[in-house]
A protein has these predicted regions:
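Conserved, single-site charged/polar hotspot
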Residues: 1-253
Length: 253
């Protein structure tokens, strides 16, 4: 049963063109979590894209599953909780800043490239702002269609601005969105202020300043969900505000 689940998880998570040599390491790295206490799979990022055992698989996924049968990635006697993302934005984030408050020595912040240039201290707002507004060299900073077709399914390739992206809201859109997603009435949104960033520049805590209420939210996923009808690609973002000439207190967008 477990191997059957892995076959169908690997298929939606990776294209049929994915290099066979990389699939075994992908399986060992990710799909080796300890069993949930009360159920086998969850709908969170922990279990990725499990879509049922009847979901079509690929020969590559099937071969990789059987080639890695019984293999797990360990650290000091425990199975590694080795999360991953399709695009890190140029820098890895430390585990505790995105998920549970547990610091894993094998999941640390570092640069996603071969360059010897040291990763800036992206916990500092000035450095994070500069980093996010530029496009540093990184393995995931590519528009090479041949490379992308090997690692992403067709529907994932529809997103072309995954490395650096932009979202724009009017005052009304933003205030209504935050109210709907958080269940809290902030009134008009005056500002979104970074309170804490992780080692990759991702926001861990964000202060929402409204005309009726001010509140700090976090962590990373809550911030992404609050500021989008689904979720933002990342919490590694900076905010620019625009004002109308006759209104300098509250941004128009």
């Amino acid at each position: 049963v477990a191997n059957g689940k892995l076959k169908v998880i690997m298929h939606p998570d990776n294209t049929a063109n994915f290099e066979l040599s990389t699939l075994p390491s992908q399986l060992i790295k990710w799909y080796d979590h300890e069993t949930h206490k009360n159920f086998d799979v969850c709908a969170d990022d922990h279990c990725q894209r499990y879509q049922g055992i009847t979901r079509a698989s690929t020969p590559q996924a099937i071969e990789a599953v059987f080639a890695t049968r019984g293999e797990v990635l360990m650290y000091e006697g425990e199975i590694c909780d080795a999360r991953f993302s399709k695009c890190c934005g140029g820098a890895f984030e430390e585990f505790q800043n995105c998920w549970e408050n547990v610091k894993h020595p094998y999941l640390i912040g570092q640069r996603d490239s071969k360059t010897e240039t040291r990763l800036p201290d992206l916990t500092k707002e000035a450095e994070a702002d500069k980093w996010i507004r530029t496009s540093p060299t990184a393995f995931c900073n590519t528009h090479n269609k041949q490379v992308l077709s090997q690692v992403l399914n067709n529907y994932d390739q529809e997103t072309t601005d995954f490395y650096r992206w932009r979202v724009c809201y009017s005052q009304q859109e933003l205030s209504e969105l935050i109210h709907k997603r958080s269940g809290i009435e902030f009134g008009k949104i005056i500002d979104l202020i970074p309170v804490e960033r992780g080692t990759s520049g991702r926001l861990v805590r964000l202060k929402i300043v409204g005309t009726l209420r001010t509140l700090i939210i976090g962590k990373e996923l809550e911030i992404r969900r609050t500021l989008s009808s689904s979720h933002l690609y990342s919490s590694a973002f900076v905010v620019d505000k625009e004002y109308k000439e006759d209104e300098k207190e509250i941004p128009s967008r």
